[in-house]
């Protein structure tokens, strides 16, 4: 898949990192609440082995998504998703749907609908810290 800037993006590129994978759409009210948090998390934790990847499920594609990304100053890669992409994660029935993926590539948490900022941040820190402890001698 390619992002809004034309760069090839694969989830496997972030292997070894804690990844927040967010399925969203420009028309989704709760998604608009979460995206600023994800921008903040990307800024705060990217140097600790954390990454955010957005998957827009907008039917209008880049025509709707690119202006939204510019307006919100989204600082992480976003790709366009579809049914097959959603099925790779067991199906995405409603938006937003967010997965936290650990450094080994396993789904550590799943949130369907709006979850609280502190919920996400606590889980991110837990995954970052547990990975750090596992790496300690």
Region roles according to the model:
Residues 131-137:
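Non-globular targeting/processing and membrane-anchoring segments
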Residues 1-19, 42-45, 89:
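A short beta-strand-turn-helix
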Residues 17-19, 23-27, 34, 94:
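Short pre-active-site segment immediately N-terminal to redox-active cysteine/selenocysteine motifs
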Residues 32-72, 81-88:
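Structural microenvironment flanking redox-active thiols in thiol-disulfide oxidoreductases
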Residues 14, 23-24, 68, 76:
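Conserved hydrophobic/aromatic "anchor" residues
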Residues 67-75, 80-125:
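Thiol/disulfide oxidoreductase modules built on the thioredoxin-like
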